[in-house]
UniProtKB/Swiss-Prot annotation:
Cellular compartments per GO CC: cytoplasm
Native source species: Vibrio cholerae serotype O1 (strain ATCC 39315 / El Tor Inaba N16961)
Localization in the cell: Cytoplasm
Gene Ontology MF terms: DNA binding; endonuclease activity
Function, as annotated: Sequence-specific endonuclease that cleaves unmethylated GATC sequences. It is involved in DNA mismatch repair.
Gene transcribed to yield this protein: mutH
Matches recorded under CDD domains: MutH-like (cd00583)
Position of the signal peptide: none
Name of the protein: DNA mismatch repair protein MutH
Length: 221
């Protein structure tokens, strides 16, 4: 892996240097093998970009470039530049959430400054031939932060009230909460409606595609 960048500008320069390159070219330099597809290697693109950009946090709660206060997010896009899938933000806390505020939340920390890297995501393009797009450094506007905060507070209220099982992907205007587990057996602690501990599937916060589409549209228009 390349050393961690010491400044925001150094990180941006690195991201600009890999724009236009294919996954095959980037994997070759990193000594990584391109998988046939992403079905069993969902995190492969992120790991490839982390190697080239010198990200250190992996999937821990900290930002990928903690010393710079920047999170790295790849975003698969269509031929027309629209996001093809929701963006995972972080795992949702299901216990110990009483008194937790938006200002202290992992979601706010992760989204305070994001380096978005669009990548070609159309399925018919072989993975090795897909290319990386131009990077975009983004922080939420006051309006965007207000939207995120409102959704986060609503979703967390359901968790506090022990209604995690009733939350569906339809809840939340820009932020949604969905099960995040490779299989249905990976259960975690949560609260039931009676306040007693229950076992539940881990949940993750995800940004809806219409929210990320607006970010890309404003920047690349």
């Amino acid at each position: 892996m390349k050393p961690a960048p010491t400044t925001q500008q150094e990180l941006l320069t690195r991201a600009q240097q890999i724009a236009g390159l294919s996954f095959a070219e980037l994997a070759d330099e990193a000594g990584m093998t391109v998988p046939p597809d992403l079905r069993k290697d969902k995190g492969w693109v992120g790991q490839l970009l982390e190697w080239h950009l010198g990200a250190t946090a992996g999937s821990r709660p900290q930002q990928d470039f903690e010393h710079l206060g920047i999170e790295l997010k790849s975003i698969p896009i269509s031929y027309t530049g629209k996001p093809l899938e929701t963006t995972f933000v972080c795992v949702a806390p299901l216990t110990g959430v009483h008194g937790l505020t938006w200002e202290q939340s992992h979601v706010r920390n992760k989204l305070s400054k994001v380096l978005w890297i669009p990548v070609q995501g159309e399925r018919e393009i072989p993975l090795a031939e897909r290319c990386v797009g131009s990077p975009l450094l983004w922080s939420p506007s006051p309006e965007e932060e207000a939207q995120l905060k409102a959704d986060w507070e609503e979703l967390m209220e359901w968790i506090v009230l022990g209604k995690v099982a009733q939350i569906t992907a339809k809840h939340g205007e820009v932020l949604q909460l969905r099960p995040k587990a490779a299989n249905g057996r990976a259960l975690t602690e949560a609260y039931g409606a009676n306040g007693r501990p229950i076992k539940a599937l881990p949940r993750g916060f995800y940004l809806r595609t219409q929210f990320t589409a607006q970010i890309l549209q404003r920047y690349y228009a």
